[in-house]
Amino acid sequence: MRRPVIAGNWKMHMTCAQAREFMAAFLPLVADMPNDRDLVLAPPFTALSSMADLCKDSPIALSSQNVHWEGSGAFTGEISPSMLKEHGVTYTIVGHSEPRKYFSESDEQINHRARSSQANGLIPIVCVGETDEQRERGEAERVIRRQIEQGLEGLDADLLVVAYEPIWAIGTGKTCEAAEANRICGLIRSWVGSPDLVIQYGGSVKGGNIDELMGMSDIDGVLVGGASLQPDGFARIANYNVA
């Protein structure tokens, strides 16, 4: 039985003070959240310590927004799995389209990050997705399959989450039709060959489309960007209801 994972990625938003203000408003809104799902927040590294305290005795698990594959060393600006675990982190986001685009992250590097996460008891959320140009050229499936085959090599499918995020839908207000997102998620499941693999959808997820998305047979959760920055909006997503 696949357990849904609802995750919010704060990206480069929220100081510690802002995180505390958010949580003061958000926690009461998810106090009665159904217990058939997992709720995850990925704050900036600087807010992890504060968030670890704020999330105690709550249904919220913490994720990092990235992780390095080495345990220590001369890797300026990076952070190791053990450093994250010290702050109560249980998930790591790897392969997001922004580091792929802005820092030229390769599928091989993403695989190293994901494998290091699993080796250290963390659950990687591995992001995959196509650009608008690739979609228009009919290359979406080929691109995503390559990302899956190279990015997930050597990983335990029972200890990871895959997030399908069509890049053209991230932060644009454009949303992939639920049926099409479901079709791609189903393809990913077949390529990996694991019926129990948890697969999220990400890309302009909001309160107005969460129920439809979560009603799809192959969508097991969402990875939320901008809508996770507002307590009311993200609480609506966390408390989704599938009729």
Curated annotation (Swiss-Prot):
Pfam families: TIM (PF00121)
EC code: 5.3.1.1
Disulphide bridges, residue numbers: none
MF terms (GO), sorted A to Z: triose-phosphate isomerase activity
Enzymatic class: isomerase
Superkingdom of the source species: Bacteria
Similarity comment: family membership: Belongs to the triosephosphate isomerase family.
HAMAP family hit by this protein: TIM_B
Protein known as: Triosephosphate isomerase
Organism: Synechococcus sp. (strain CC9902)
Gene coding for it: tpiA
